[in-house]
A protein has these predicted regions:
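Residue-level signal for pocket-adjacent positions within structured domains
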Residues: 11, 34, 38, 51-52, ...
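Short, surface-exposed acidic-centric catalytic microdomains
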Residues: 42-55
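Active-site-proximal N-terminal segment of extracellular/periplasmic enzymes that hydrolyze or transfer
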Residues: 1-37, 46
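A short beta-strand-to-alpha-helix junction
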Residues: 22-25, 44, 69-76
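Catalytic-site neighborhoods of secreted/periplasmic enzymes
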Residues: 55-153
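PAPS-dependent sulfotransferase catalytic core
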Residues: 29, 41-42, 60
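Conserved S-adenosyl-L-methionine
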Residues: 37-44, 88-94
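Short helix-loop boundary/capping segments at the starts of domains
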Residues: 13, 38, 62-66
Length: 153
């Protein structure tokens, strides 16, 4: 059996054709819908990014009584248990918080991982001069404005 779990921090399900949205044109999600199981009755303990990931790894609620942070030495990780039992897992993530102080140690639980650079406030590319900010973009993080110059359309 193969299983793929897709997680998004900022994507609302009411905007997806898989959940009944008929005015968004999303051919990749429509194609994905044909090959996946859709869960309609799922509840989360934490909505913020890192607390939600810790709950996913450990199976324990932690938000409101534990701060944003790494796995602790006493934490059991689902993905580490899979690895110890010869079940391969892979993390592909643009969630740069995994590599920040306080957020580390999550990706080491997987069999392998790749970090997709350049999202949000990830300081992927360097530039001394401040980037030009087009008026229609509003206020964005400096690293994002620098990074987007290096991303292909």
């Amino acid at each position: 059996m193969k299983a793929i779990m897709v997680m998004y921090d900022s994507l609302n399900r009411h905007m997806l054709p898989n959940y009944g949205c008929d005015w968004i044109i999303a051919p990749n999600f429509a194609r994905l819908r044909e090959r996946v199981v859709t869960f309609d009755n799922h509840f989360v303990g934490s909505m913020p990014c890192m607390p939600a990931r810790r709950e996913m790894h450990t199976g324990r609620y932690n938000f409101l009584h534990r701060s944003w942070g790494p796995h602790e030495p006493f934490d059991d990780s689902t993905f580490l248990e899979l690895k110890h039992n010869n079940v391969y897992s892979h993390l592909a993530s643009d969630h740069y918080h995994y590599w920040e102080d306080g957020g580390a140690t999550y990706h080491h639980r997987y069999s392998s991982w790749v970090n997709v650079r350049g999202q949000e406030g990830d300081p992927w590319k360097g530039q001394v001069a401040n980037p030009e900010v087009p008026e229609h973009l509003g206020r964005l993080a400096r690293p994002f404005l620098v990074n987007r110059r290096y991303m292909q359309e």
